[in-house]
Design a protein with these regions (language model features):
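Surface-exposed, glycine-biased beta-strand/turn segments
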Residues: 1-63, 91-92, 101, 131-144
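Residues in well-ordered beta-strands of folded domains
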Residues: 22, 77, 107
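Short histidine-centered loop motifs in beta-beta connectors
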Residues: 38, 43, 53, 68-95, ...
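Conserved, short, structured surface segments that act as functional micro-motifs
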Residues: 88-144
Length: 144
């Protein structure tokens, strides 16, 4: 796992062999293509524009969607509070908000179809396994 990406996301340096990805989760179909990550603070792992800040009526948590480029978006979900608003341009390491009960969900979306559709504002996106991004195998400038 690429500790640089994860350290940026959680806002601190990981200690040797520390695993912040919640066991039993991961980027697979069982979690609708997202990784749950143990953290208090949530920081941006890339530059982009906040296109959506939505509140989930069931969990009463926030989800922030960031447009990275014409084909890629990242979502930071299960946030108890957020520090950004729609239209904000953010940079890598900028604070997004705080995780709900020290657990947030990171999602990677593109316009390429998958079995996990998600509607963001008026756009249909599709979730994909975020593990390659978190591991450093896939850069956000590359498209799956």
């Amino acid at each position: 796992m690429n500790t640089t990406v994860l350290s940026t996301l959680i806002g601190r340096t990981l200690s040797d062999n520390e695993n912040v990805i919640e066991q039993g989760y991961g980027g697979s179909s069982q979690t609708t293509a997202g990784c749950f990550i143990k953290t208090q603070t949530v920081n941006s792992i890339c530059n982009g524009t906040v296109v959506s800040v939505e509140r989930d009526a069931i969990t009463n948590t926030w989800c922030v969607t960031v447009w990275v480029n014409s084909q890629q978006w990242v979502r930071y979900c299960y946030l108890s509070s957020v520090k950004v608003i729609t239209g904000t341009t953010i940079s890598m390491n900028d604070s997004i908000g705080y995780a709900y009960k020290n657990l947030m969900k990171f999602e990677y979306c593109t316009s390429a179809k998958s079995k996990f559709p998600v509607r963001v504002s008026n756009q249909q996106l599709y979730k994909h396994d975020p593990t390659p991004i978190l591991s450093g195998q896939l850069k956000l400038s590359e498209v799956i």
